């Protein structure tokens, strides 16, 4: 089934008063120390190096029990001689990031439960051990470089109110191929009987509406990225480069194309939690290795179809968020480098281009669903 026109109009959303990125020089900072425990078993020590208490959201971060991406893995850079008699003639093989085979979660920005939060006093630290072979194929063995950096959301009460930067050392390890191959994958594809499950009832209706809204949001965001306000694009992507604008627009168009049909495309979209990774804080999960998306219960109970609030979450931008993650929609898929407006707008241009929430925020910050017949322009930025 292909979707056509929306019953409602998508209009520019007024975000006239822009929140400023966090002044990360004045905020606490998290230092991550990575070490090898045994072959692919890694330990992370996360320390608050600032001078004040910090409460951060540990979903998609260290302490999360789900198989989320905590570090990036790279095959090490090396040099290949091209001629035995001319050592100066070499070919340099640059590091390549290994594909992540775990899950990525979108979590709510308000109403977070206590079990999603970690509090660290100045100088205090937490430890987390995890096996990188459970979420990446390391059966080839060899030299691997491990590191992580980005921004983690901080919370006041149960609401995300800012972000703090974190970074780690660069850890190089030698992986034993046989041991790595013996580690069970954290996520396995569903069997065929489960994959044929389909949406029905109110959830089917809600997802159909979300997909229609996603098509309109993504198409209009593509136009705005390609030829809209340069200052607005700069706000989110930290550049006005024509090549970057073209790339962003292409990803939005790919999302619109993917959302336009429920009978074809690169992703499989489930109305319910097929893997058991949902929680009261998570409206949706994505499995990038399999291009699978699944909605959680609070997608339907907590999120509106399309918000009227700038940079707030809703069903449409959550669906857009998940499609933006998927490498099958547009390769490479995006990562979770900065969550929420504060963190996303603190990223560099290259990071923003690879940050899933930057796309959702740009689409949400630019447009608004209105049931009015007359289209009114709300702002001219």
From Swiss-Prot:
- Please give the coiled-coil regions recorded for this protein: none
**Is Calcium set as a keyword in this record?**
no
InterPro entries noted in UniProt: Fungal_M35_metalloproteases (IPR050414), MetalloPept_cat_dom_sf (IPR024079), Peptidase_M35 (IPR001384)
Can you tell me which residues form the catalytic site? 322
**Propeptide residue span(s):** 20-193
UniProt remark on cofactor binding: Binds 1 zinc ion per subunit.
Residues noted as binding Zn(2+) in the record, renumbered to the chain: 321, 325, 336
Give the transmembrane region(s): none
Quote the Gene3D superfamilies the UniProt record gives: 2.60.40.2970, Collagenase (Catalytic Domain)
Give the enzyme's EC designation. 3.4.24.39
Q: Please, which domain of life does this record's source organism belong to?
A: Eukaryota
Please provide the Gene Ontology terms (biological process) for this protein: proteolysis
| UniProt keyword annotation of Translocase present | no
Concerning PROSITE patterns, the annotation shows:
ZINC_PROTEASE
UniProt keyword terms in alphabetical order: Cleavage on pair of basic residues, Disulfide bond, Hydrolase, Metal-binding, Metalloprotease, Protease, Signal, Zinc, Zymogen
Q: Which reaction does it catalyse?
A: Preferential cleavage of bonds with hydrophobic residues in P1'. Also 3-Asn-|-Gln-4 and 8-Gly-|-Ser-9 bonds in insulin B chain
Per its UniProt record, the required cofactor names are:
Zn(2+)
Gene Ontology molecular function: metal ion binding; metalloendopeptidase activity
The record's disulfide annotation reads 199-271, 278-296
Q: Which residues form the signal peptide?
A: 1-19
Stored CDD domains: M35_deuterolysin_like
Any one Pfam family match given in the protein's UniProt record, by short name: Peptidase_M35
State what this protein does. Secreted metalloproteinase that allows assimilation of proteinaceous substrates. Shows high activities on basic nuclear substrates such as histone and protamine.
* Family, similarity comment: Belongs to the peptidase M35 family.
Q: What name does this protein carry?
A: Neutral protease 2 homolog mep20
Q: Which organism is it from?
A: Aspergillus flavus
Gene responsible for this protein? mep20
């Amino acid at each position: 089934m292909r979707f056509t026109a929306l019953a409602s109009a998508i209009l520019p959303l007024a975000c006239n008063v822009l929140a400023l990125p966090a002044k990360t020089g004045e905020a606490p900072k998290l230092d991550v120390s990575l070490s090898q425990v045994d072959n692919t078993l890694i330990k992370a020590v996360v320390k608050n190096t600032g001078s004040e208490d910090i409460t951060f959201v540990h979903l998609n971060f260290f302490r999360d029990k789900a198989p989320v991406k905590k570090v990036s893995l790279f095959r090490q850079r090396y040099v290949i001689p091209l001629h035995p008699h001319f050592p100066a003639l070499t070919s340099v093989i640059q590091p390549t990031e290994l594909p992540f085979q775990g899950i990525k979660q979108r979590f709510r920005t308000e109403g977070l439960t206590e079990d999603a939060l970690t509090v660290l006093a100045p100088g205090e630290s937490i430890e987390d051990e995890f096996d990188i072979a459970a979420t990446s194929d390391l059966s080839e063995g060899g030299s691997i470089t491990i590191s992580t950096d980005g921004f983690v959301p901080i919370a006041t009460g149960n609401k995300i109110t800012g972000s703090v930067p974190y970074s780690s050392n660069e850890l190089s390890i030698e992986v034993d191929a046989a041991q790595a191959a013996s580690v069970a994958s954290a996520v396995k594809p569903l069997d065929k009987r489960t994959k044929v499950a389909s949406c029905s009832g109110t959830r089917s209706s809600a997802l159909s509406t979300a997909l229609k809204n996603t098509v309109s949001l993504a198409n209009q965001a593509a136009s705005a990225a390609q030829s809209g306000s340069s200052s607005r694009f700069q706000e989110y992507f930290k550049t006005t480069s024509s090549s970057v604008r073209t790339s962003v627009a292409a990803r939005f168009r790919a999302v619109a194309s993917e959302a336009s049909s429920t009978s074809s495309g690169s992703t499989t979209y489930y109305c319910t939690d097929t893997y058991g990774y949902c929680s009261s804080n998570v409206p949706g999960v994505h499995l990038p290795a399999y291009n699978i998306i699944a909605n959680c219960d609070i997608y339907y109970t907590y999120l509106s179809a399309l918000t009227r609030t700038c940079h707030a979450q809703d069903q449409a931008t959550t669906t857009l968020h998940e499609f933006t993650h998927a490498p099958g929609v547009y390769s490479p898929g995006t990562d979770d480098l900065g969550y929420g407006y504060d963190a996303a707008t603190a990223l560099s241009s290259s990071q923003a281009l690879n940050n899933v929430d930057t796309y959702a925020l740009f689409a949400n910050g630019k447009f608004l669903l209105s049931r009015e017949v007359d289209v009114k322009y709300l702002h001219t930025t």
